[in-house]
Amino acid sequence: RDYYASRGLGDVYKRQDDQGQELGRAGSLWVLLNLSTRHMAPPDSILSLMPDNSDLVAPLGLPGPVTEVSGAVTTERKVPVYTDLDVNHHVNNTKYMDWCCNALGIDCMKEHALRRFCLNYDVEVLPGQEIRTELRTLGDHFSYCGFHESQRSFDIGGELMARK
C-alpha cells in the first residue's frame, strides 16, 4: 500500500506492506526556478494551480540541517557530465546521492544500505563548474557536501545499515 500527499511545493511518500508495516518513507520540498535569472522565483504565481491540502496532517516533519560528521575527510574534484544534468540544465538533486554513494565506494555499498539520509540543496551546480566534494564517515554515519569555489552547493547526511 502506498501513501502520497502533495503539500504545496513538496511531496511525501510512504510505503507499507500488506500488514500495514511501514517499509519506507520519503519527503521532498522544492522551489521554483526562474530560468532567465537562475534564481528562486516566488511561488505566488502558481499557488492557485496547486491543490488545497491545508487539512492534511504532514506525516513527516520538515527536514532539519545536515549534521557534519567529525570523521576523517576524503576530498574529490568533480565536473558535472551530461548525464548529471536535468531539463533545467543543472545537476539534478538525485545525482548528488549518486555522487555520495560512489564516494562511499562499491565495497561499502555492497555491504550496507541507506537507513536514512537528508539532502539539502543550497545553490545549483551548472555544467563546467568544478565541485570540491568532502566525504566524512564515522561508524555508520556519513556526511557528504559539495562546494563551488567557497559556496556550499549541497550537503547530505545519513546513516548506513548492514544489508541482510
Enumerate the predicted regions with their spans.
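Solvent-exposed strand-loop boundary residues in beta-sheet-rich modules
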Residues: 18-19, 36, 150-152
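Acidic/His-leaning functional-site neighborhoods
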Residues: 76-160
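Single conserved hydrophobic/aromatic residue that forms the stacking wall/gate
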Residues: 2-13
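Residue-level detector of beta-strand face positions
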Residues: 14, 31, 143-145
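Acidic, low-complexity central loop/insert segments
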Residues: 15-28
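Hot-dog-fold acyl-thioester-processing enzymes
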Residues: 25-27, 34-115
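A structural microfeature
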Residues: 24-26, 42, 152-156, 162
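Short beta-strand edge segments in extracellular beta-sheet folds
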Residues: 29-33, 161-163
